[in-house]
């Protein structure tokens, strides 16, 4: 980590050791991750050096709060390895989405039936998290509407946690008018059970079985796609089971037409090692101009990157 002395050397333009000499000679993006005693970090001299570096375009990954190596409590802990990695990736990534406002829906929804049971699906939110992260790395301002159990997102992504399809619809609808791009990757329940009530349904009253009625939920993708303003672009997703990728593409063609998405990605959730809860997807992708591609067993991170690049140019 960058010590108080290292910050002083960098701010003063020193070239007295390998680190300061390399930093002074380097004309690319410079990231500095300090860690030190909390009183050293708060000292006016250190803060002046930090301000000087920031004015020169250096990105400072400010230390976190907690117990430091000397045993004192306060701001001085090195940021996590995940934060360091994301900051480095962002510095190296093309900023071709800078200035764009992006909304991503991700994860499942849970439709309650009684006090303990609900209707849902096994979506993990990993595909949507990959989309949100990729857009943020490429410079976009990202709003993520997250169903239950979604993975962590970069601190720079604004997260909106919801539970039901209705809540996801309302959250997405409230954000959509200000967005430039939307990726609707959430596995939203198409139907909700008509609620039994807040109490737990007891099996003793249904020894011969029972029936549950369902009501339709809002179609988030279609509603927001049809209601978009000029210039907005829509990336839709379809979780499907199909015997092969050609059959999946047939399903995608029909769904893209119904949803009026600029780009639609069909996900073969029954493909081995792909789909819900995995790190890979097999996709059939189609845009509004009729261009089609099939991607087999690719990482969700790679899929996310490619989908944004495609949506930008469609």
Each model region followed by its residue ranges:
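Short glycine-rich anion-binding loops that position phosphate/pyrophosphate groups of nucleotides
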Residues: 1-8, 36, 66, 107-111, ...
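Glycine-rich phosphate/diphosphate-binding loop of Rossmann-like nucleotide-binding domains
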Residues: 47, 51-52, 94-164
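A glycine- and small/hydrophobic-rich beta-loop-beta segment
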Residues: 147-148, 156-222, 226
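Glycine/threonine-rich flexible loop motifs
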Residues: 4-14, 40-43, 113-120, 191-203, ...
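Short, glycine-/small-residue-rich phosphate/pyrophosphate-handling segment
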Residues: 27-65, 73-88, 227-263
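Short, acidic/small-residue loops that bind anionic groups at enzyme active sites
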Residues: 10-37, 52-54, 59-61, 207-223
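Gly/Ser/Thr-rich active-site loops/lids in small-molecule metabolic enzymes
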Residues: 120-138, 201-222, 257-266, 294-301, ...
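Glycine-rich phosphate/pyrophosphate-binding loop and the adjoining helix
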Residues: 65-100, 120, 270-314
């Amino acid at each position: 980590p960058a010590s108080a002395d290292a910050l002083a050397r960098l701010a003063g333009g020193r070239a007295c050791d390998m680190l300061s000499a390399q930093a002074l000679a380097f004309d690319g993006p410079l990231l500095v991750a300090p860690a030190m005693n909390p009183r050293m970090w708060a000292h006016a001299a250190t803060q002046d050096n930090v301000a000087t570096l920031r004015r020169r375009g250096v990105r400072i990954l400010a230390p976190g709060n907690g117990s430091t190596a000397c045993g004192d409590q306060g701001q001085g802990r090195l940021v996590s390895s995940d934060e360091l990695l994301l900051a480095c990736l962002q510095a190296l990534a093309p900023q071709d989405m800078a200035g764009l406002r992006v909304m991503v829906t991700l994860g499942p929804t849970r439709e309650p039936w009684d006090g303990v049971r609900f209707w849902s699906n096994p979506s993990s939110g990993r595909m949507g998290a990959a989309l949100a992260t990729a857009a943020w790395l490429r410079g976009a301002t990202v709003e993520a509407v997250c169903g239950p159990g979604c993975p962590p997102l970069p601190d720079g992504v604004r997260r909106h946690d919801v539970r039901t399809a209705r809540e996801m619809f309302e959250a997405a609808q409230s954000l959509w008018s200000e967005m430039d791009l939307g990726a609707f990757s959430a596995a939203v329940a198409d139907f909700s059970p008509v609620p039994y009530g807040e109490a737990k349904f007891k099996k003793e009253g249904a020894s011969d079985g029972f029936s549950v009625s369902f009501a339709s939920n809002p179609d988030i993708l279609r509603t927001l796609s049809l209601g978009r303003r000029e210039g907005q672009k829509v990336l839709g997703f379809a979780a499907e089971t199909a015997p092969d990728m050609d059959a999946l593409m047939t399903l995608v063609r029909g769904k893209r037409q119904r949803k009026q998405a600029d780009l639609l990605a069909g996900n073969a959730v029954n493909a081995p090692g792909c789909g819900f809860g995995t790190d890979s997807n097999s996709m059939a992708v189609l845009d509004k101009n009729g261009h089609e591609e099939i991607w087999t067993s690719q990482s969700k991170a790679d899929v996310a990157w490619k989908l944004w690049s495609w949506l930008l140019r469609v």
